[in-house]
Structure formats: C-alpha cells, structure tokens
Regions:
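C-terminal recognition in membrane/secretory proteostasis and scaffolding
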Residues: 2-10, 26-32, 40, 44, ...
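A conserved glycine-rich beta-strand in the N-terminal activation segment of trypsin-fold
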Residues: 34-44, 63, 86-105, 130-133, ...
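Catalytic-histidine neighborhood of serine endopeptidases
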Residues: 103-105, 109-143, 150-154, 163
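Flexible, gly/ser-rich surface segments that form the specificity/activation loops bordering the active-site cleft
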Residues: 114, 158-162, 170-204, 239-241, ...
Length: 485
C-alpha cells in the first residue's frame, strides 16, 4: 500500500454545538439559561490532556542509488516489460510527529512510522522550546506502535481508557502537533470501531474517527470526554491528497499490550500457528463449493514443522472459529492468535471441503520477520534466455519458472508452477488481482508444475466453470477466484 495512507491531512469538523436540544427553550423573551450538566467547553479536558502530548522530532539520512527494478539482465527486463530507472545521492530527512507520555518516568508511546529508520529522536514537552534526547525502547511495525524513553521524572502521564468500550458516536478529541503547531486540539466522533483489511499494518483493529488528524498528528492522542486515552493516532485515508474525514487510531488496549511487551522484553511476543491465511470471500466460497460457509480465514499455506502442520491443517481449509469464537475474516484470526501467549492451546473449528473438523494445537512463538515477504537478495546471471510464453484464461501470459526467473523473483526452491509474464488488466485474471511475477501453483486443486500443465488444465475447463487458483504472490501463497466469462 502506498505511504500516502500514512500522510496526515488537515480537515474541519465545522461548528460544534455542545448542548442538547432541550438545553434552550424558546420563549417570547428569548431563551432560558443553559441547564446544569450540559457541556459547553472541553477546555478542562484539554488542560488535563495537553501536557501529556509531546512533539517527536526525527533525523534520518537516506541513500538513493541503484535500480528501482529488480532485474539487471536485459532479457529479463524485456520479458517482464520493466524499465530501469536510476536514482543517486544522499539526503538528510527531518521528520515531525507526536507522542503520548504514559508514565511519570519518561516512557512515551508514538506511532512506529514516525520513528522508523530514525537515526536521532528528540522530544519536545508541551510548549517548552527545549528538546530532550529520546531512546527507542522498541518498535512493532505489525501494529504501528513504538515506545520511546526520555530521562526525565515526574512527567504528566495520561490515563488509559478501556478502548473495548468505545462505540460509534462517542465524542472524541485528537491532540497533537500538526505542522509543528504544538498542542493543537480537534474534535469529532468515533465513526466506527474494529476497522481492518486496509493493508496499513498486519494487525489492524483501528478506531475510525472524523476528528481532524493532520500531518504531524501521527503518534498523538485520541481521548474521550473524560480525558482518557482511547487510541494513538496513526493514519488517514485520502484519495485526493486532502482530508476526507477518515482517520484511524490504534486502540489504547492494543497499544498498551504492545507497550508492556516492548518495555519488558524489547520486542513483541505473539502466538503463532504457522499458517498463511486470507479472508474467505463469497466468490472463493462459491468456487470452492463450500455450502453454508461464506466467512472465515482461508489457509493458503502451511509452514513446515509449524503447529498447523503438526496438527494436520491443510491448504484450502477454512478456519471458522477459535476456542468457540466465530472468525469472520483473516484479520480477526491474526488478532486473536497474535494476542495469545506462546504455549497456550487453541481449538480450531475448520471447514474442509464442506466437512467440519476440530483441531487442537499448541501455539508456538511467532518467529522474527514471519510477516516479511521474500528472502535475501540474489544477483541474476549475466545472460538469460527468455522462456516461451503461453496465454491462458483470456489474457494471462505464463511461462515456466526457469532458474533465472527464480533468482530474479527471489522465489523459494519449493515454489513451482507457471509464472505470469504479462497480464491484461481487463482479463478475468487481471480483474481478480493477478499480476506479473505471480506464480500459479494450482487450478481447481490440480497441481501446476509447468506452463504446459496449466495449458492442459485450462483446456478442460468449461466457459461456465468458476476457477479457483492457488497463487504464490509477494512472498505468500493464497487463493484467487476467477469468474466465468
């Protein structure tokens, strides 16, 4: 996903009327006084919260050089239709964000993307012009949470709210330092809770708000009307580059859980079952002929020697529930398993080809970098022959996975199939999300080892057949459903 999702823009909530319709009663003489208990100002809340919100300054030196295209060989570039743009030089980048003091002895929560790659981090307290050097205690890209520490005492720590109790419609305030303007406060409501599936981070459970979250607000506080921390402001969605009133905050309960792990261990420890999953869509369920099952987490890949493999989980299984709690999508499964301690037991309810099965497994600890895609870079051979291309599915050109292509695409040795060399964006495959460089491994549960295998399978398909494709893409295997023409 483009980094623009982390770009924070200005927005306006307009005039806010902080009284109920019963606060005034029209009379011939005018209006009656405001009734006791009606909130007419959030100033007391802001005065309580603002000292806990800090400015985070970062410095980073970036090197720009080499190719933006992974293939240095002309034949491979021609094969994939790529170009070879060049950029050179170094640049020092100054970053600006916000943070929240969470303990009197100097621990500060912020967003990971605010401090990611920073060589120096400084913190400004309130409107004090002085800056304090901050140490990075730990980061968690999976949730976009980072924990910093400054060597100061008796700091005004914020109070945490129970973000699980947050509801759409609740009034919230966003406090941060947009564009370097310290102690800026905006107001809105919670638009939704439990937002995910946007590809911002691996573990998404965002609070959505229409409170203005601007550039520099990332890492700042989203608070309730009691002045308690509901979330850490993280991102805003925009198609135009301007504000559209759709901001996202990391729930306080999740941020606190990550913070405690970072503070105690310097890293986040998560449960792990060793299965790559995706959300089961109605189209996939239809292609897989799963009657009565339209939601869940579809297993696209099972890691060797993992808890999933040891207990008998297979690709194509649909995880419908964990410990009796229904799973509606892959996001829910990741959050649930990730929040469980390694060594704990998990009972999985699984739909396998229409049959319900139950598996009990013991969670392992998630290995570092498990969600990273690909592996170490390798240099292609100096000379490469272009493999022959064959077109299938009305606009998908495929070829065999040669040694050169395997090296260029950084494909694991156990990934076999037909690589997509070219694809028509308007073809069924293009519309389903297939892209150049993907490797087709199965079609309707029939294995594909070569382009010839794929051609043979495709010839036996009827025009009205739904097509279920297992594909290796961006470091993972998953499923794609192609609708008939």
């Amino acid at each position: 996903m483009e980094r623009r999702i982390f770009r924070l823009f200005a927005s306006s909530t307009g005039a806010i009327l902080c009284v109920s319709t019963s606060a005034f009663s029209a009379t011939a003489q005018g209006t009656t006084p405001i009734q006791p208990g009606v909130i007419t100002s959030f100033a007391p809340i802001v005065e309580k919260v603002a000292p806990s919100v800090v400015t985070v300054f970062t410095t980073q030196t970036v090197s720009r050089g080499g190719s933006a295209f992974p293939f240095s060989d002309d034949a491979l570039r021609q094969f994939f239709g790529g170009q070879l743009p060049q950029t050179q030089g170094k640049q020092t980048l100054q970053g600006l964000g916000s943070g929240v003091i969470v303990s009197p002895d100097g621990y500060i929560l912020t967003a990971n993307h605010v401090v990611s790659g920073a060589e120096e981090i400084m913190v400004g307290l309130g409107v004090d012009p002085r800056k304090y050097k901050a140490k990075k205690i730990g980061t968690d890209p999976g949730t976009d949470v980072a924990l910093l520490k400054i060597e100061e005492k008796n700091l005004p720590a914020i109070t945490f709210a129970d973000s699980d109790k947050a509801r759409a419609g609740d009034i919230v305030l966003a406090v941060g330092n947009p564009f370097g303007l310290r102690q800026t406060v905006t107001m809105g409501i919670i638009s939704a809770v439990g937002r995910g599936g946007m590809g911002i981070v691996d573990y998404e459970n965002f609070i959505q708000t229409d409170a203005a979250i601007n550039m520099g607000n990332s890492g700042g506080a989203l608070v309730d009307i009691k002045g308690q921390l509901l979330g850490i402001n993280s991102a805003i969605f925009s198609r135009t580059g301007g504000n559209q009133g759709v901001g996202f905050a990391i729930p306080a309960n999740l941020a606190r859980e990550v913070m405690q792990s970072l503070r105690d261990k310097g890293r986040v420890v998560r449960g792990y079952i060793g299965a790559s999953v995706q959300t089961l869509t109605p189209e996939l369920a239809d292609a897989m002929k799963l009657k009565g099952q339209s939601t869940g987490a579809l297993v696209g890949e099972v890691a060797p020697n993992s808890p999933s493999q040891k207990t008998g989980l297979k690709t194509g299984d649909v995880i419908a529930a964990v410990n009796g709690k229904k799973i509606t999508d892959a996001r829910e499964l990741r959050l649930m398993i990730g929040s469980m301690a390694p060594g704990s037991k998990a009972q999985l309810e699984v739909n396998r080809e229409g049959q319900t099965k139950t598996f009990e497994l013991q969670l392992a600890e998630m290995p570092p970098g498990t969600t990273e895609e690909g592996g170490p870079e390798a240099s292609p051979e100096e000379t490469t022959q272009q493999p022959e291309k064959t077109t299938v599915f009305g606009g998908v050109a495929v070829a065999d996975v040669t040694d050169d292509i395997r090296t260029a695409l950084n494909l694991p040795k156990d990934v076999h199939g037909a690589v997509i060399a070219e694809i028509d964006a308007d073809s069924p495959g293009g519309k389903a999300g297939l892209r150049e460089g993907d490797v087709i491994q199965e079609v309707n549960k029939q294995p594909v080892r070569t382009a010839k295998d794929l051609v043979a399978i495709s010839k036996n398909l009827k025009p009205t057949d739904k097509i279920l494709i297992r594909v290796y893409s961006q470091g993972r295997s998953g499923y794609v459903a192609l609708e008939p023409k």
